[in-house]
């Protein structure tokens, strides 16, 4: 089945490409989603008329992806995880965990766009890539820190009780 792509489709082609796909993929996914249209003489004329509009829309999406990439690149996102000896994590840092950490910083990205070569299973800094558009990939750093070490840095209970008593005495005077 030959179709004309109405938008960029990952692992298939770009806007305006005429590609051959299996019938089921075309009928059940590309055509209902509006990502493609059948190649017929009538559809070719219709596509030529709407090509400029589609091209402008794709350029807008690309420019928004570029702006978001500028915001993301150089960003350091901290993720707290439980870790055992030798800085090994109990479990691993997943794309959904990274997505939630980005959302906390005001950047909303679908977890499926976050690219991990392998699961993150150790503490430290790791470089993570995000595919924002077919042509735009941004990189940022995920700092995986241990929850236990953060709790160990808190002052002892006796120290906090002493400082609380001192503050109460100052206010009583």
From Swiss-Prot:
Region (Disordered): 151-173
UniProt GO molecular function: rRNA binding; structural constituent of ribosome
GO cellular component: ribonucleoprotein complex; ribosome
Pfam families attached to this UniProt entry: Ribosomal_L9_C, Ribosomal_L9_N
Entry keyword set: Ribonucleoprotein, Ribosomal protein, RNA-binding, rRNA-binding
Disulfide topology: none
Superkingdom of the source species: Bacteria
BP GO annotations: translation
Residue stretches in coiled coil: none
Cited NCBIfam families: L9
PANTHER family in alphabetical order: 50S RIBOSOMAL PROTEIN L9
Assigned protein family: Belongs to the bacterial ribosomal protein bL9 family.
Functional summary from the UniProt entry: Binds to the 23S rRNA.
Protein name per UniProt: Large ribosomal subunit protein bL9
Lineage, top ranks: Bacteria, Pseudomonadati, Thermodesulfobacteriota, Desulfovibrionia, Desulfovibrionales
Designated gene of the protein: rplI
């Amino acid at each position: 089945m030959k179709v004309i792509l109405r938008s960029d489709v990952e692992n298939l082609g770009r806007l305006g490409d005429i590609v051959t796909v299996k019938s089921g993929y075309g009928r059940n996914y590309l055509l209902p989603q509006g990502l493609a249209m059948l190649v017929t003489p009538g559809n070719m004329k219709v596509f030529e008329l709407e090509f400029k509009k589609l091209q402008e829309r794709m350029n807008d999406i690309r420019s928004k992806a570029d702006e978001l990439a500028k915001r993301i690149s150089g960003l350091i996102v901290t993720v707290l995880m439980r870790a055992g000896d030798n800085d090994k994590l109990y479990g691993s840092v997943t794309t959904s965990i990274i997505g939630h950490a980005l959302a906390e910083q005001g950047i909303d990205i679908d977890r499926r766009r976050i690219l991990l070569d392998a699961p993150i299973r150790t503490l430290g800094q790791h470089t993570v890539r995000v595919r924002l558009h077919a042509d735009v990939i941004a990189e940022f750093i995920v700092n995986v820190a241990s929850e236990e070490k953060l709790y160990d840095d808190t002052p002892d209970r006796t120290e906090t009780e002493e400082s609380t008593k001192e503050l109460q005495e100052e206010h009583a005077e």
